[in-house]
UniProtKB/Swiss-Prot annotation:
Recorded name of the encoding gene: prfB
HAMAP family xref list: Rel_fac_2 (MF_00094)
Compartment annotation: Cytoplasm
Keywords for the protein's UniProt record, in alphabetical order: Cytoplasm, Methylation, Protein biosynthesis
Name this polypeptide is given: Peptide chain release factor 2
NCBIfam families assigned: prfB
Database matches in PANTHER family: CLASS I PEPTIDE CHAIN RELEASE FACTOR, PEPTIDE CHAIN RELEASE FACTOR 2
Residues the record lists as N5-methylglutamine modifications: Q250
Length: 367
């Protein structure tokens, strides 16, 4: 069936116009100009932490503007390609136009989803923690599978990731792991993954080959910015140091470089052992602790509102996705009902369709 290119391109232009309106390009350009002025100040690097915040935000705003404005050019180029192909009755060029149309539609959909990320912290980088829950060794193995899935997703997108801490289980898998995804809007995107994930499969660890159901929890936090003013007094934190350990509990470091921070008022505990020095591990652990305290404050505020409304739907312990490998293969989001049969691709990080569905579902719930 022949593609109705004029209708398709008209739909693209309508969506693109809506994206430009929602994105408020004038405000982005003004912010970019202000950031450029601040970045050019000779005194910028007198405060390295503030300088890094400015340069990171500058890069993010510039990338956002480029992404939106270049999309308009791609739609224009597509229209020209279609006109030339139809005038010359060139089948190869029309096939090329069809390929380009599909690519533009996919990227425009991703851009449209980005406009839905308007929450207070959505533009931040993300700190992800995965914990094995019920299910014994299978749960630990599942937690490691999820960790790899998210790291592969970040790799596929060209995002930098940094593993802060990994607590290995004795037989296989991990008890828990914490890592950062350093990319604009990583928090807004990955926060829809928060909750309990369920795996159903024939256990590779069961001698009788029985089916096993196991669970793992995913927590996603925004990286704290200096503007959040999350101050942690030294007298409220106990610092313990120990040797880093690997799979099976084996020591992987001959010095006490791993760090455990305990926030005494709340009891929150954070560990970091993957950096090279104790100082680096302490700094990374403090970033995670600040993120957890920021999230605790947000949840406390939300709990007050939920108590007034009688709403307890915000619990991150709710099951949100099932991964079934036996007796059939299916990954299904229990909130959106979106499902995919190619389970291997999902575990290899191809989760954009789930993320998009989750973001749209969340936005609908807010409206």
């Amino acid at each position: 069936m022949a593609i109705d290119f004029p209708s398709e391109i008209s739909a693209l232009r309508t969506t693109y116009a809506s994206i430009r309106e929602v994105s408020d390009l004038d405000a982005l350009r003004k912010e970019l100009a202000d950031l450029n002025d601040e970045a050019a100040a000779p005194s910028l690097w007198d405060d390295p932490e503030h300088a890094q915040t400015v340069t990171s935000r500058l890069s993010a705003v510039q990338a956002e503007l480029d992404r939106i404005e270049k999309m308009g050019g791609r739609i224009d180029d597509l229209e020209v390609l279609v006109e030339l192909s139809e005038d010359e009755h060139d089948a190869d060029s029309l096939a090329e136009a069809e390929t380009e149309l599909n690519e533009v539609k996919e990227q425009l959909a991703q851009l449209e989803v980005r406009t839905l990320l308007s929450g207070e912290y959505d533009s931040r980088e993300a700190i992800v923690t995965i914990r094995s829950e019920a299910g014994g060794v299978d749960a630990a193995d599942f937690a490691e599978m999820l960790m790899r899935m998210y790291l592969r997703w970040a790799e596929r997108r060209g995002y930098k990731s940094e593993v802060y801490d990994t607590s290995y289980a004795e037989e296989a898998g991990i008890k828990s792991a914490t890592f950062k995804v350093a990319a604009p809007y990583a928090y807004g995107t990955l926060s829809v993954e928060q909750g309990t994930h369920r795996l159903v499969r024939i256990s590779p660890f069961d001698n009788q080959g029985r089916r096993q159901t196991s669970f793992a929890g995913v927590e996603v936090l925004p990286v704290v910015a200096e503007t959040d003013h999350v101050d942690v007094p030294e007298n409220e934190v106990r610092v313990d140091v120990y040797r880093s350990s690997g799979p099976g509990g084996q020591s992987v470091n001959t010095t006490d470089s791993a760090v455990r921070l305990t926030h005494l008022p709340t009891g929150i505990v954070v560990t970091c052992q993957n950096e090279k020095s104790q100082l680096q591990n302490k700094a990374a652990a403090m970033r995670v602790l600040q993120a957890k305290l920021l999230e605790k404050a947000r949840k406390d505020r939300q709990a007050e509102l939920d108590a007034l409304k009688g709403d307890d739907s915000g619990s991150w312990g709710n099951q949100m996705r099932s991964y079934v490998l036996h007796p059939y293969q299916m990954v299904k989001d229990l909130r959106t009902n979106y499902e995919v049969g190619n389970t291997s691709s999902i575990f290899d990080g191809e989760i954009d369709s789930f993320l998009e569905a989750g973001i749209r579902w969340r936005k609908q719930g807010e409206s």
